[in-house]
Amino acid sequence: MLTITTNRFENDVLRADKPVLVDFWAQWCPYCRRIAPAFDKVGEQYADTLIAGKINYDEEPQLIQRFGIDTIPTLMLFKDGKVLGSIVAPGSKAAIEAFIQETLAQ
C-alpha cells in the first residue's frame, strides 16, 4: 500500500502509469479504520489495473485543502493527472469495487 505525501503526489498520483485509487483517511476516524481492510483487499485484487494509496488527513493538509476533503474516508480515483470520480464513506468492499468499475468505464 502506497503512502502518498504532498511531496510525492505529482509523481505517485498525477504521473502514474496506471489509475490511482486514493483513500483520504485519519487514524482517529473509526469509520476509516473499519473500511481499511476492504480498501487494502481491493488494492491487492486490482494491483494489475490500478495503484492503491493512502493520504493521511492530519499529515497532508495541503492535499486535503486542494481536493476539498471535508468528510473521511473519501476515496478518489485519478487517471492521467485528473480526478475521475470520488466516493464518500463507502460501505463495503463491493461498494469500492463498484465505484472503481463504474468510474473506469466512463
Which residue ranges define each predicted feature?
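A short beta-strand-turn-helix
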Residues: 2-20, 61
